[in-house]
């Protein structure tokens, strides 16, 4: 049986590597080892200078030091962790978790046999809890820098020439000039602006402003039905705002599988969030204490003007390389201002590499982290690896949404013969006992080999459950392989096992 699995997995691994997302290039591993020519000569020159202290940058810096490279990290924010830790992933999860607890206590305890009265929101305390989490984690990265002997330069970096970076110090730090044999650009991304709409972070806000509102708005309009928009919309809806999501596309959720997107719209709508899909924003301007918004439905060309207390602009992010001096060096960039690199993260100046949001691929913190490790390993050891078919994505609404691999739409477009297996959380014993059983797991497999191609789920703790699916895809597992693994009972993970069984043999046990 093992031999057949190995042969099947090897065959499908070759086939599946051709299914790269257009923006992502496959990481290639060199067979031969290189000499450690990346090491500095000991004259004050660094082996590695990482520009940017976000998830990709700080991880690259730590890994570089662990591999024996004399490393310095330059960060202009004043705190490490980048957008993710300071004004993104981490503070948003704090608000998502605490707003969910509040909403559950206020609206979902009576049926559980818990009588509660007098529940209210202390927004300032909720914001303090968020800020405390951020502060703890940012200081934790500084500790890791010291532990691993990574030097930390607080300031704004700009290339003087391909070997030299000028750093203008901030927060009392001195200006300095850094010479290094290798550079990694990890400057991340910034909020994508909407033409004609001015973000003041008070009435018209980006995700940054939405994390720090001083009061719960009565009405909030969210421009963009992607991950950021729906997460922040969920926070403020739970706290009492009337939230309307305006989405240009026919469906919400961006790149997620169509079936999961439909389930998400249905479930989130029941929570009180309104959706206006196939709708474009024509204008938005502050009018006294409110924002006047004009939109147009692209299906019937009907226009609508209304007032909202806060407008959140969440239409995505764009690479950030401002002031770095890349044009002076002649570093190649594409039309979207992304730095172009090869399979080893090298720009057209080979000793300058780039990772994360500043280059191609999904703008995800964990993708940047893996690229940071791979880029440093290419420098120090001559080989690195990131499997771009196995980058999971998670939306932390309730229920959570998570996916890895290709969607059913992508399988159709690629001409792949495939099978589908699904299993609803309403048939999962742990979800039922938790009274939290909305959603499903959907598995896509190669019809000829049973090899996993994609796993998509919406349901309780989906962000934690997707790890098993990602591991299975990484190692070329079949649906049968996962279905035959004993899963503890009662657990939410049994829903994954049952969906795998449905994909493999056509039938699950409990549905």
Swiss-Prot record:
Disulfide bridges in this chain: 84-89
Binding site for NAD(+): 224-231, 247, 281, 316
Localization per record: Mitochondrion matrix
Group of enzyme by EC: oxidoreductase
Catalytic activity: N(6)-[(R)-dihydrolipoyl]-L-lysyl-[protein] + NAD(+) = N(6)-[(R)-lipoyl]-L-lysyl-[protein] + NADH + H(+)
Superkingdom of the organism of origin: Eukaryota
Residues bound to FAD: 75-84, 93, 157, 187-189, 357, 363-366
Oxidoreductase found in the keyword field: yes
Example of a GO cellular component annotation carried by this entry: mitochondrion
Cofactor(s) demanded: FAD
Pfam family, one: Pyr_redox_dim
PROSITE patterns: PYRIDINE_REDOX_1 (PS00076)
Enzyme Commission identifier(s): 1.8.1.4
Cofactor note: Binds 1 FAD per subunit.
GO molecular function: dihydrolipoyl dehydrogenase (NADH) activity; flavin adenine dinucleotide binding
Main localization category: mitochondrion
Keyword Coiled coil among UniProt keywords: no
GO biological process terms on file: 2-oxoglutarate metabolic process; aerobic respiration; glycine decarboxylation via glycine cleavage system; pyruvate decarboxylation to acetyl-CoA; pyruvate metabolic process
NCBIfam families reported in the protein's UniProt record: lipoamide_DH
Family note: Belongs to the class-I pyridine nucleotide-disulfide oxidoreductase family.
Extra remark: The active site is a redox-active disulfide bond.
Function according to Swiss-Prot or TrEMBL: Lipoamide dehydrogenase is a component of the alpha-ketoacid dehydrogenase complexes. Malfunction of this protein blocks the progression of cell cycle from G1 to S phase.
Subunit record text: Homodimer.
Identification of the protein by name: Dihydrolipoyl dehydrogenase, mitochondrial
